[in-house]
């Protein structure tokens, strides 16, 4: 290597590189540690970010931090204190929580994260709130628990694993209790018995309540419409939305009917439309694209909630209530085939009645006799079902008294059916065709029971005689089957005995043959030995000579 070449000193800048560590402040490490403290949810349920409050204005003391670069997260004096706020309703939004926090004089909220169920996206009832100072955290723990939020007092706890496990356990218990009761969690204000409500102008925008008993068609909802309701979910069913028809003059709701079930679901956030629903394509309708903000699709309602209250005046609304009287179908609209629950215009279900099992008769379905439900049933349920009672047109005919000639004609027909069935069944049973005999008797019994005179004593005598014959043939068929089984068992036993005898005889023969063969082998060996001895003696004699 030439002497003129300059040697490179690779250790020249080592001290400068080590001295660069002093350029980084120590509190950044503390911030990283504080960030690690904020835990995630158990069972893999990380806190789902509802809406990050990026648009919150910074407090007056930190105006100078606006010029910081975008990747700098902590601009509040290097502090980031996390707290848990629980005992919230599942429909509480981050806006509601932010308003409640601001109402107690705290303006340095950095972040709000709601814990949600991964299965349905519903809030678990508690959230992680980060504030920027110790004084704000102390004020939050002291004052927020005294404020009422949707009828419940929030619980503020420090951010640790013990508090997280307590809130998780509380959310699981509430979910299990809601599933056991069959009603889900408590619904939003206006659908439960709690007195917590929304401030004026806010609840009406998010919860469009129908004014009258039959006026269940809400107008256009605000930007945040209620989410769609999938078939099979519990709660008051949603009905087809559309423009209201002529509703008549205003009047009080019908007697016995209180506030109709609210149609609005939980308050949706105003900056997001409801998620698109593509289920109607399964019912012969064209698939729907993403739904714009507005009224929800027909047949969908809120998530599980309690049944509607049965007392109280109707809420104020844009439509006047209907006068009391019979309610007809609304403008020819019929409920879709996949919708469960009462049809449009029917009374709301009672708290103890499941509308899936007790649907009241639809007003848009024509009745067979023009008469309505019995007057004693307030929910319009059909009369109890009687097994021996004919259905359809025979039911109407059975109400009208029969003439003597018709009665005798039907009785003669039943007698002929009974006698022919018994004779044919006996002949089939004698030929050991028990299945055909039993089928004949069962058919005859069902025909006589379906006749118009089945309640008469003479018909009952015919039915009892047919049933006695049926029981006798059944017992005989069972006895014959048992006899066949016994015979088959005896045959199997005899066959098995014969097989065992043959096997024993074969085994004896095999043993005898084996012993014979062994004795022959021994004799052969003895003969060979004797021959060898003789040969040896001869050789000896020959040598001695």
Curated annotation (Swiss-Prot):
According to the UniProt record, where is the region Disordered?
Answer: 37-69, 165-404, 478-545
Q: What is the first-listed, main subcellular location in coarse terms?
A: nucleus
Q: What SMART domains would the database entry show? A: RRM
Q: Which GO terms describe its molecular function?
A: mRNA binding
Regions of biased composition (Pro residues) lie at 220-230, 237-265, 287-363, 372-383
InterPro entries with a match to the protein in the record: CPSF6/7 (IPR034772), CPSF6_RRM (IPR034769), Nucleotide-bd_a/b_plait_sf (IPR012677), RBD_domain_sf (IPR035979), RRM_dom (IPR000504)
Compositional bias annotation for Gly residues = 184-200
Here the segments flagged for biased composition (Basic residues) are: 498-508
List the PROSITE patterns.
Answer: RRM
Q: Which compartment or compartments is the protein found in?
A: Nucleus; Nucleus, Nucleoplasm; Nucleus speckle; Cytoplasm
Record's Gene Ontology CC terms?
cytoplasm; interchromatin granule; mRNA cleavage and polyadenylation specificity factor complex; mRNA cleavage factor complex; nuclear speck; nucleoplasm; nucleus; paraspeckles
User: Which N-terminal stretch is annotated as signal sequence?
Assistant: none
Bias (Basic and acidic residues) ranges: 384-397, 483-497, 509-545
Q: For this chain's UniProt record, which GO biological process terms are given?
A: co-transcriptional mRNA 3'-end processing, cleavage and polyadenylation pathway; mRNA alternative polyadenylation; positive regulation of RNA export from nucleus; protein heterotetramerization
Q: Where is the composition biased (Polar residues)?
A: 165-180
RRM domain residues: 81-161
What UniProt keywords are attached to this protein's entry? Answer: Cytoplasm, mRNA processing, Nucleus
Q: How does it assemble?
A: Component of the cleavage factor Im (CFIm) complex.
| Similarity annotation | Belongs to the RRM CPSF6/7 family.
Stated role: Component of the cleavage factor Im (CFIm) complex that functions as an activator of the pre-mRNA 3'-end cleavage and polyadenylation processing required for the maturation of pre-mRNA into functional mRNAs. CFIm contributes to the recruitment of multiprotein complexes on specific sequences on the pre-mRNA 3'-end, so called cleavage and polyadenylation signals (pA signals). Most pre-mRNAs contain multiple pA signals, resulting in alternative cleavage and polyadenylation (APA) producing mRNAs with variable 3'-end formation.
Q: What name appears for this protein in its UniProt entry?
A: Cleavage and polyadenylation specificity factor subunit 6
């Amino acid at each position: 290597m030439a002497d003129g070449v300059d040697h490179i000193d690779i250790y020249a800048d080592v001290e400068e590189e080590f001295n660069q560590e002093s350029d980084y402040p120590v509190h950044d490490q503390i911030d990283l540690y504080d960030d690690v403290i904020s835990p995630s949810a158990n069972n893999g349920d990380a806190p789902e970010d509802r809406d990050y409050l990026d648009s919150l204005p910074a407090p007056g003391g930190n105006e100078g931090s606006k010029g910081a670069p975008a990747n700098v997260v902590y601009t509040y004096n290097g502090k980031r204190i996390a707290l848990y706020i629980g005992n919230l309703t599942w429909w509480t939004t981050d806006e509601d929580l932010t308003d409640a926090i601001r109402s107690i004089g705290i303006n340095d909220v950095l972040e709000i994260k709601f814990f949600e169920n991964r299965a349905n996206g519903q809030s678990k009832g508690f959230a992680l709130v980060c504030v920027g100072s110790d004084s704000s955290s102390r004020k939050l723990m002291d004052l927020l628990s005294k404020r009422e939020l949707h009828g419940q007092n929030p619980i503020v706890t420090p951010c640790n694993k013990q508090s997280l496990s307590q809130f998780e356990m509380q959310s699981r218990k509430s979910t299990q209790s809601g599933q056991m009761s069959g009603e889900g969690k408590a619904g939003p204000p206006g659908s439960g018995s709690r007195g917590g409500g929304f401030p004026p102008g806010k609840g009406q925008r998010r919860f469009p309540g129908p004014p009258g008993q039959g006026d269940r068609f809400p107008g256009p909802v605000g930007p945040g419409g209620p989410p769609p309701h999938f078939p099979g979910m519990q709660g008051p069913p949603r009905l087809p939305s559309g423009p209201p028809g002529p509703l008549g003059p205003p009047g009080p709701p019908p007697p016995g009917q209180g506030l109709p079930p609210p149609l609005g679901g939980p308050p949706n956030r105003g900056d997001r439309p409801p998620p698109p629903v593509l289920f109607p394509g399964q019912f012969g309708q064209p698939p729907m694209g993403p739904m714009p903000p507005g009224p929800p699709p027909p047949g969908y309602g809120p998530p599980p909630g309690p049944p509607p209250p049965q007392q109280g005046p109707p809420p104020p609304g844009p439509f006047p209530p209907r006068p009391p009287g019979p309610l007809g179908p609304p403008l020819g609209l019929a409920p879709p085939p996949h919708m469960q629950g009462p049809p449009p215009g029917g009374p709301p279900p009672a708290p103890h009645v499941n509308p899936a099992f007790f649907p009241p008769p639809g007003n848009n379905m024509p009745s067979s006799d023009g008469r309505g439900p019995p007057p004693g049933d307030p929910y319009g349920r059909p009369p109890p079902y009687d097994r021996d009672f004919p259905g359809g047109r025979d039911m109407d005919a059975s109400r009208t008294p029969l003439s003597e000639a018709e009665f005798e004609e039907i009785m003669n027909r039943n007698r002929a059916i009974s006698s022919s069935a018994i004779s044919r069944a006996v002949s089939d049973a004698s030929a050991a065709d028990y299945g055909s005999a039993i089928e004949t008797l069962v058919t005859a019994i069902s025909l006589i029971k379906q006749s118009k005179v089945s309640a008469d004593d003479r018909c009952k005598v015919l039915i009892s005689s047919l049933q006695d014959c049926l029981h006798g043939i059944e017992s005989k068929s069972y006895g014959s089957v048992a006899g066949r089984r016994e015979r088959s068992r005896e045959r199997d036993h005899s066959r098995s005995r014969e097989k065992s005898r043959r096997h024993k005889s074969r085994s004896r023969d095999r043993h005898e043959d084996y012993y014979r063969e062994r004795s022959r082998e021994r004799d052969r060996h003895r003969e060979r030995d004797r021959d060898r001895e003789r040969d040896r003696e001869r050789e000896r004699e020959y040598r001695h000579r």
